[in-house]
């Protein structure tokens, strides 16, 4: 998809870069697959901020996505490719031969009129979903389950892709884009191909207001705060952080410090993403 730049009629337009998407559906989404969602503004049930830089933004309906791909052996036709405000990837509306419609994450190259199917004996073709035990080693996949039947959890964002590099016993080894090598049960399902809208990372919003419409609030530097608000705060004039290692507002080191605590699944990581 080509990139579109604008005439510098304003500072925001001067900096903006957009991805041209002529194949996206221009009408309303499928109403039966919409759900309402309310915004929390990053607050918990006590009203205290638990996630910073969240708040405001445009209202959106949630699109109910079929992450499980459990409608086995029934072919479906891609009715259209749609924009989804809740994720970076586009979504595809499938119409099954029995009349049911479902949304899936749109793989790269999938277009309206294509046919996809899910099942253990599905052909190795973009958009088809099948267990890792039936996918050839070396194949690029996305939308991978971590537990059989739980639904896709890995590689769902725009341009995401994972390579199946080995299969031994009850586990398959995957190479993630981060460089991490991870073992996943071979009964877990994955979708062939990589996620579409892979040029999303080349977009530039151009102005702060575009970020605010997405519900993202400003990030203030710790050094610009008062001493009671941040470890880097305080001091006379433009004082530095006064700390040999930058830290979060709660004193946790921010650069190179490992914060992963889930030892239960550490056994499945063959190689760390840091090499």
Swiss-Prot record:
Classification via InterPro entries: NA-bd_OB-fold, Rib_uL2_dom2, Ribosomal_uL2, Ribosomal_uL2_bac/org-type, Ribosomal_uL2_C, Ribosomal_uL2_CS, Ribosomal_uL2_dom3, Ribosomal_uL2_RNA-bd_dom
Name by which UniProt lists this protein: Large ribosomal subunit protein uL2
Entry GO MF terms: RNA binding; rRNA binding; structural constituent of ribosome; transferase activity
Function comment: One of the primary rRNA binding proteins. Required for association of the 30S and 50S subunits to form the 70S ribosome, for tRNA binding and peptide bond formation. It has been suggested to have peptidyltransferase activity; this is somewhat controversial. Makes several contacts with the 16S rRNA in the 70S ribosome.
UniProt entry tagged with the keyword Ribosomal protein: yes
Subunit note: Part of the 50S ribosomal subunit. Forms a bridge to the 30S subunit in the 70S ribosome.
Pfam families cross-referenced by the UniProt entry: Ribosomal_L2, Ribosomal_L2_C
Cited Gene3D superfamilies: 2.30.30.30, Nucleic acid-binding proteins, Ribosomal protein L2, domain 3
GO cellular component, one term: cytosolic large ribosomal subunit
GO BP field: cytoplasmic translation
Keywords: Ribonucleoprotein, Ribosomal protein, RNA-binding, rRNA-binding
Domain of life: Bacteria
Family: Belongs to the universal ribosomal protein uL2 family.
Lineage of origin: Bacteria, Pseudomonadati, Pseudomonadota, Gammaproteobacteria, Lysobacterales
UniProt KW Amino-acid biosynthesis keyword: no
Region named Disordered: 223-275
């Amino acid at each position: 998809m080509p990139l579109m730049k604008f005439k510098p009629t304003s500072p925001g337009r001067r900096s903006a870069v957009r991805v041209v998407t002529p194949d996206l559906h221009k009408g309303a989404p499928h109403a039966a697959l919409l759900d309402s969602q309310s915004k929390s503004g990053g607050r918990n049930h006590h009203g205290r901020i638990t996630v910073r830089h969240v708040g405001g933004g445009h209202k959106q309906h949630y699109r109910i996505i079929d992450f499980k791909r459990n409608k086995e052996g029934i072919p479906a036709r891609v009715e259209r490719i749609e924009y989804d405000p809740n994720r970076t990837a586009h979504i595809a509306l499938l119409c099954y031969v029995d009349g049911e419609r479902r949304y899936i994450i749109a793989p790269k190259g999938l277009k309206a009129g294509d046919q996809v199917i899910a099942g253990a004996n599905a052909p190795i073709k973009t958009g088809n979903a099948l267990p890792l035990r039936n996918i050839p080693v070396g194949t690029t996949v996305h939308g991978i389950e971590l537990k059989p039947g739980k639904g896709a959890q890995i590689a769902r964002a725009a341009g995401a892709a994972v390579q199946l590099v080995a299969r031994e016993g009850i586990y398959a080894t995957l190479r993630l884009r981060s460089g991490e090598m991870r073992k996943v049960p071979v009964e877990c399902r994955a979708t062939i191909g990589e996620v579409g809208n892979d040029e999303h990372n080349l977009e530039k919003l151009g102005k702060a207001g575009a970020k605010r419409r997405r519900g993202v609030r400003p990030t203030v530097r710790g050094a610009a705060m008062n001493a009671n608000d941040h470890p880097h705060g305080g001091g006379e004039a433009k004082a530095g952080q006064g700390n040999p290692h930058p830290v979060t507002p709660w004193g946790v080191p921010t650069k190179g410090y490992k914060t992963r605590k889930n030892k239960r699944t550490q056994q499945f990581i063959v190689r760390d993403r840091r090499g």
